[in-house]
Amino acid sequence: MAKMQAKVQADERDDGLREKMISVNRVTKVVKGGRILGFAALTVVGDGDGRVGMGKGKAKEVPVAVQKAMEQARRNMFKVPLKNGTLQHEVHGKHGASMVLLAPAKDGTGVIAGGPMRAVFDVMGVQNVVAKSHGSTNPYNLVRATLDGLRKQSTPGDIAAKRGKSVEDILG
Protein backbone atom coordinates (compact mmCIF):
# COMPACT_ATOMS: atom_id res chain seq x y z
CA MET A 1 0.00 0.00 0.00
CA ALA A 2 1.50 3.30 -1.07
CA LYS A 3 1.66 6.14 1.42
CA MET A 4 1.50 9.76 0.31
CA GLN A 5 2.89 12.38 2.64
CA ALA A 6 1.72 15.81 1.56
CA LYS A 7 3.74 18.90 2.30
CA VAL A 8 2.26 20.93 5.11
CA GLN A 9 -0.03 23.40 3.39
CA ALA A 10 -1.26 26.57 5.06
CA ASP A 11 -4.44 28.47 4.43
CA GLU A 12 -6.03 31.55 6.00
CA ARG A 13 -9.81 31.51 5.92
CA ASP A 14 -12.18 34.48 5.87
CA ASP A 15 -13.22 33.60 9.45
CA GLY A 16 -9.67 34.42 10.64
CA LEU A 17 -8.64 30.82 11.27
CA ARG A 18 -5.34 29.41 10.05
CA GLU A 19 -5.53 25.92 8.57
CA LYS A 20 -2.69 23.49 7.90
CA MET A 21 -2.87 20.10 6.28
CA ILE A 22 -0.31 17.80 7.92
CA SER A 23 -0.67 14.61 5.91
CA VAL A 24 -2.77 12.78 3.35
CA ASN A 25 -2.50 8.99 3.26
CA ARG A 26 -3.90 6.61 0.68
CA VAL A 27 -5.72 3.81 2.46
CA THR A 28 -7.20 0.57 1.13
CA LYS A 29 -9.96 -1.72 2.27
CA VAL A 30 -9.67 -5.25 0.93
CA VAL A 31 -13.03 -6.81 0.10
CA LYS A 32 -14.15 -9.94 -1.71
CA GLY A 33 -14.15 -8.19 -5.09
CA GLY A 34 -10.76 -6.49 -4.69
CA ARG A 35 -9.49 -3.31 -3.08
CA ILE A 36 -11.43 -0.15 -2.27
CA LEU A 37 -9.15 2.90 -2.33
CA GLY A 38 -9.68 5.95 -0.14
CA PHE A 39 -7.81 8.83 1.46
CA ALA A 40 -7.27 9.93 5.07
CA ALA A 41 -6.30 13.54 5.84
CA LEU A 42 -4.90 15.02 9.06
CA THR A 43 -5.25 18.78 9.64
CA VAL A 44 -4.85 21.40 12.37
CA VAL A 45 -6.71 24.70 12.69
CA GLY A 46 -5.90 27.67 14.92
CA ASP A 47 -6.72 31.34 15.37
CA GLY A 48 -3.13 32.56 15.87
CA ASP A 49 -3.98 33.59 19.44
CA GLY A 50 -3.78 30.36 21.41
CA ARG A 51 -6.78 28.39 20.12
CA VAL A 52 -6.04 25.13 18.29
CA GLY A 53 -7.83 21.99 17.13
CA MET A 54 -7.05 18.90 15.07
CA GLY A 55 -9.19 16.87 12.72
CA LYS A 56 -9.03 13.67 10.74
CA GLY A 57 -11.18 13.03 7.68
CA LYS A 58 -11.61 10.01 5.43
CA ALA A 59 -13.21 9.92 1.99
CA LYS A 60 -12.87 8.48 -1.51
CA GLU A 61 -11.44 11.78 -2.85
CA VAL A 62 -8.63 13.91 -1.37
CA PRO A 63 -10.47 17.29 -1.32
CA VAL A 64 -13.47 15.76 0.46
CA ALA A 65 -11.22 14.11 3.07
CA VAL A 66 -9.39 17.39 3.68
CA GLN A 67 -12.67 19.30 4.00
CA LYS A 68 -14.01 16.78 6.54
CA ALA A 69 -10.77 17.03 8.53
CA MET A 70 -10.90 20.86 8.56
CA GLU A 71 -14.52 20.84 9.78
CA GLN A 72 -13.68 18.37 12.54
CA ALA A 73 -10.66 20.46 13.57
CA ARG A 74 -12.85 23.58 13.86
CA ARG A 75 -15.27 21.69 16.11
CA ASN A 76 -12.46 20.38 18.35
CA MET A 77 -10.73 23.70 19.09
CA PHE A 78 -9.60 24.57 22.62
CA LYS A 79 -7.77 27.51 24.24
CA VAL A 80 -4.15 27.28 25.39
CA PRO A 81 -2.86 29.95 27.81
CA LEU A 82 0.18 31.59 26.20
CA LYS A 83 2.66 34.02 27.75
CA ASN A 84 4.30 36.55 25.39
CA GLY A 85 4.11 34.25 22.36
CA THR A 86 5.47 31.18 24.15
CA LEU A 87 4.31 28.55 26.63
CA GLN A 88 3.74 29.11 30.36
CA HIS A 89 6.07 26.32 31.50
CA GLU A 90 7.76 23.09 30.40
CA VAL A 91 5.34 20.22 29.86
CA HIS A 92 5.29 16.62 28.61
CA GLY A 93 2.64 15.13 26.34
CA LYS A 94 1.97 11.53 25.38
CA HIS A 95 -0.24 9.65 22.97
CA GLY A 96 0.34 6.03 22.07
CA ALA A 97 4.08 5.47 21.58
CA SER A 98 4.76 9.17 20.90
CA MET A 99 6.08 11.41 23.65
CA VAL A 100 6.84 15.11 23.33
CA LEU A 101 8.64 17.62 25.51
CA LEU A 102 7.45 21.21 25.07
CA ALA A 103 9.43 24.05 26.63
CA PRO A 104 9.07 27.84 26.55
CA ALA A 105 11.84 29.80 24.83
CA LYS A 106 13.22 33.34 24.94
CA ASP A 107 12.31 35.96 22.35
CA GLY A 108 14.17 35.45 19.08
CA THR A 109 14.49 31.67 19.46
CA GLY A 110 11.74 30.83 16.98
CA VAL A 111 9.86 27.56 16.67
CA ILE A 112 12.30 24.69 17.13
CA ALA A 113 10.08 21.68 16.47
CA GLY A 114 9.81 18.93 13.91
CA GLY A 115 7.17 18.40 11.24
CA PRO A 116 3.67 17.97 12.67
CA MET A 117 4.51 19.78 15.92
CA ARG A 118 5.68 22.85 13.98
CA ALA A 119 2.33 23.01 12.16
CA VAL A 120 0.46 23.00 15.49
CA PHE A 121 2.57 25.87 16.86
CA ASP A 122 2.25 27.87 13.62
CA VAL A 123 -1.56 27.84 13.60
CA MET A 124 -1.65 28.61 17.35
CA GLY A 125 0.47 31.71 16.99
CA VAL A 126 3.39 30.53 19.16
CA GLN A 127 6.56 32.37 18.08
CA ASN A 128 9.14 30.91 20.49
CA VAL A 129 9.14 27.30 21.64
CA VAL A 130 11.47 24.31 21.84
CA ALA A 131 9.90 20.90 21.25
CA LYS A 132 11.44 17.44 21.17
CA SER A 133 9.70 14.22 20.18
CA HIS A 134 10.56 10.75 21.43
CA GLY A 135 9.26 7.37 20.35
CA SER A 136 6.89 6.99 17.42
CA THR A 137 7.04 9.62 14.67
CA ASN A 138 3.58 8.81 13.34
CA PRO A 139 2.11 12.27 12.47
CA TYR A 140 -1.29 11.49 14.05
CA ASN A 141 0.28 10.37 17.34
CA LEU A 142 2.69 13.34 17.39
CA VAL A 143 -0.13 15.86 16.92
CA ARG A 144 -2.23 14.17 19.62
CA ALA A 145 0.77 14.08 22.01
CA THR A 146 1.46 17.78 21.33
CA LEU A 147 -2.17 18.69 22.02
CA ASP A 148 -2.07 16.57 25.20
CA GLY A 149 0.93 18.56 26.40
CA LEU A 150 -0.72 21.87 25.52
CA ARG A 151 -3.86 20.89 27.46
CA LYS A 152 -1.68 20.40 30.55
CA GLN A 153 -0.59 24.07 30.49
CA SER A 154 -1.74 26.02 33.53
CA THR A 155 -1.50 29.72 34.33
CA PRO A 156 -0.09 31.14 37.57
CA GLY A 157 -3.69 32.07 38.44
CA ASP A 158 -4.80 28.43 38.13
CA ILE A 159 -1.98 27.21 40.36
CA ALA A 160 -2.64 29.96 42.93
CA ALA A 161 -6.33 29.01 43.06
CA LYS A 162 -5.48 25.32 43.61
CA ARG A 163 -3.09 26.16 46.44
CA GLY A 164 -5.33 28.79 48.00
CA LYS A 165 -2.69 31.50 47.64
CA SER A 166 -2.40 34.75 45.72
CA VAL A 167 -0.68 35.00 42.34
CA GLU A 168 2.02 37.21 43.90
CA ASP A 169 2.89 34.43 46.39
CA ILE A 170 3.23 31.92 43.55
CA LEU A 171 5.41 34.15 41.37
CA GLY A 172 7.62 35.13 44.28
Swiss-Prot record:
Q: Name one GO biological process term.
A: translation
Domain S5 DRBM, by residue range, is 17-80
Q: Which UniProt keywords apply?
A: Ribonucleoprotein, Ribosomal protein, RNA-binding, rRNA-binding
Which Gene3D superfamilies does this entry report, sorted A to Z?
3.30.160.20, 3.30.230.10
User: Signal sequence: where?
Assistant: none
Any Pfam family: Ribosomal_S5
Q: Name one GO cellular component term.
A: small ribosomal subunit
Q: Which Gene Ontology molecular-function terms are recorded?
A: rRNA binding; structural constituent of ribosome
Checking PANTHER family in the record gives: MITOCHONDRIAL RIBOSOMAL PROTEIN S5
Write out the domain note: The N-terminal domain interacts with the head of the 30S subunit; the C-terminal domain interacts with the body and contacts protein S4. The interaction surface between S4 and S5 is involved in control of translational fidelity.
Q: Give the protein's function.
A: With S4 and S12 plays an important role in translational accuracy. Located at the back of the 30S subunit body where it stabilizes the conformation of the head with respect to the body.
Name listed for the protein in its UniProt record: Small ribosomal subunit protein uS5
Q: Which organism is it from?
A: Paraburkholderia phytofirmans (strain DSM 17436 / LMG 22146 / PsJN)
